[in-house]
């Protein structure tokens, strides 16, 4: 059976997190972005001393904030980034690490009280199958939070056009050697992300709504985050995008109900409850 994994993409992420291990990420900024993702997460339905998993944990930046809130957290990643996560989370005693892929991670089925996968499952060949693999590990009534790249279904055609142009650059940059790839993605962060985000910040302070400005999401972020996300966006070989309806359909097909979407950036972030 063909595995639901793209090894070139896995290797790319290992390189990314080795370079951007998040040690330079300000704590307050990490919490700000964390709250963006978890604003819709139903903490109140978790049982006492919950056990869950972080699928595609990367450097462990979200696990670092989740682990203190739960009894145990499984950090799962198929790439060498897991070594970075082990280092970053070394002071936490309630975390375990599994260097495994989404279609074969060894957690027992129907054993977890919650799960999440943020910015990961759009980088596997079959996203729908990957979501099903995640939900198979959940107990009935357990929440699953996912963040998948949106297909600009809530944006103007202009956004879609910009993405199509940028995707041409991604296809070229993503096949470059690591060092050259970093040069190009850092340049994009400096000449594209930084100006647009700072212009958005100035306009917002003047009372202007900036949601329609590309990359305005980064107006409160550091240049370090921009470099990280530029590397993620332009340096990754496999990328898929989905509409809200497509994500909802995949989640329902995976046995999730009461699906809720965040109406704020980043899009789309959704949570559902295992039936």
Which residues does each predicted region cover?
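A short glycine-rich, Lys/Arg-flanked "PGG" loop and its adjoining helix->strand segment in the class I
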Residues: 128-140
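Class I SAM-dependent methyltransferase SAM/SAH-binding core
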Residues: 53, 59-104
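Conserved alpha-helix/loop element of class I SAM-dependent methyltransferases that forms part
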Residues: 28-51, 65
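C-terminal lobe and adjacent flexible extensions of AdoMet/dcAdoMet transferase-like proteins
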Residues: 217-275
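A short acidic, Gly/Pro-enriched loop at the edge of an enzyme's catalytic core
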Residues: 103-114
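N-terminal, positively charged/glycine-rich alpha-helical extensions of SAM-dependent methyltransferases
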Residues: 1-32
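Conserved class I S-adenosyl-L-methionine
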Residues: 143-175, 183-185
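A short SAM/SAH-binding and catalytic strip from SAM-dependent methyltransferases
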Residues: 113-125
